[in-house]
Swiss-Prot record:
Catalytic class of the enzyme: transferase
Subcellular location per the Swiss-Prot or TrEMBL entry: Cytoplasm
Name of the protein this chain belongs to: Protein farnesyltransferase/geranylgeranyltransferase type-1 subunit alpha
Family membership noted in the UniProt record: Belongs to the protein prenyltransferase subunit alpha family.
Catalysed reactions, semicolon-separated: L-cysteinyl-[protein] + (2E,6E)-farnesyl diphosphate = S-(2E,6E)-farnesyl-L-cysteinyl-[protein] + diphosphate; geranylgeranyl diphosphate + L-cysteinyl-[protein] = S-geranylgeranyl-L-cysteinyl-[protein] + diphosphate
A Pfam family per the record: PPTA
Top-level taxon of the source organism: Eukaryota
Organism: Saccharomyces cerevisiae (strain ATCC 204508 / S288c) (Baker's yeast)
InterPro entries linked to this entry: Prenyl_trans_a
Additional detail: Present with 396 molecules/cell in log phase SD medium.
Length: 316
């Protein structure tokens, strides 16, 4: 704040000073001064370097203040138009934003602001965004805001070349990382028209290998189902996938449905759920689906028994 003079600005009040307020917020004097100055400058529509500095000070103490983010964007857009080098100016703004991002990993205003800056940028670069994205996901591999922004970047730049390998690395690190599995599916959905049969076969093997490592992991089973549905018109894997899934349920389908105590343990309830869904799509195998859902309700996933009964009723 020392760099700029605000003595000509009369701060506007941020408190009502009404009688008998139910819960008066105890603002610090510094906070009231910052917000009062901001209100005054916004009312004057001042788009200046000192206004930009003020927004940085406020974001430092109140990083979720959407109005200030919007005001900062208006300032940046105006000052960019007066800059001799708009690329350099916006890159400096992105550098500042990187620091704010690292200190506020759960702040969602940051990401919409980044999007607005990239849309404004004459020559935006996905390569420039990758380091900050990696740092943020390394810090919290399930940070929803970061994953959403990464998806946005892929679509904005029409660039998916890094995504499959990146998702693979994260899955190798943590096979339960559902965010990485979801991002992997995002890649296939957007690249499906340029994928070869060999690549599809390799991906199917990748999925089965990961299931083999941890059969009772819902993420790859859900992914397998989505992958099969996405490419059902290009490859016929039904028998291979069914044979693979049945290796995790033993001979439970050949046994009479009795009490839970009489039924054996199986390696994966998610394999049984996958098979039930698969069999339910074919009238010739619906009896198998009904039995699989019944087994899930009775023994292998009773916490969701109402769901399994609902699915049985739909089949019947």
């Amino acid at each position: 704040m020392e760099e700029y003079d605000y003595s000509d600005v009369k701060p506007l009040p941020i408190e009502t000073d009404l009688q008998d307020e139910l819960c008066r917020i105890m603002y610090t004097e510094d906070y009231k001064r910052l917000m009062g100055l901001a209100r005054a400058l916004i009312s004057l529509n001042e788009l200046s370097p000192r206004a930009l500095q003020l927004t940085a000070e406020i974001i430092d103490v109140a990083p979720a203040f959407y109005t200030i983010w919007n005001y900062r964007f208006n300032i940046v857009r105006h000052m960019m138009s007066e800059s001799e080098d708009t690329v350099l100016y916006l890159n400096k703004e992105l550098d500042w934003l990187d620091e704010v991002t690292l200190n506020n990993p759960k702040n969602y205003q940051i990401w919409s602001y980044r999007q607005s800056l990239l849309k404004l940028h004459p020559s935006p670069s996905f390569k420039r965004e990758l380091p900050i994205l990696k740092l943020m996901i390394d810090d919290d591999s399930k940070n929803y805001h970061v994953w959403s922004y990464r998806k946005w970047c892929c679509l904005f730049f029409s660039d998916f070349q890094h995504e499959l390998a990146y998702a693979s690395d994260l899955i190798e690190t943590d096979i339960y990382n559902n965010s990485a599995w979801t991002h992997r599916m995002f890649y296939w959905v957007n690249a499906k028209d340029v994928i070869s049969k060999v690549e599809l076969a390799d991906e199917l093997q990748f999925i089965m290998d990961k299931i083999q490592l941890v059969p009772q992991n819902i993420s790859p089973w859900t992914y397998l189902r989505g992958f099969q549905e996405l490419f059902h018109d290009r490859l016929q894997w039904d028998s291979k996938v069914v044979d693979f899934a049945t290796t995790f349920i033993g001979d439970v389908l050949s046994l009479p449905i009795g009490s839970p105590e009489d039924l054996p343990e199986i390696e994966s309830s998610y394999a049984l759920e996958f098979l039930a869904y698969h069999w339910g799509a074919d009238p010739c195998t619906r009896d198998n689906a009904v039995k699989a859902y019944s087994l899930l309700a009775i023994k292998y996933d009773p916490i969701r028994k109402n769901l399994w009964h609902h699915k049985i009723n739909n089949l019947n």
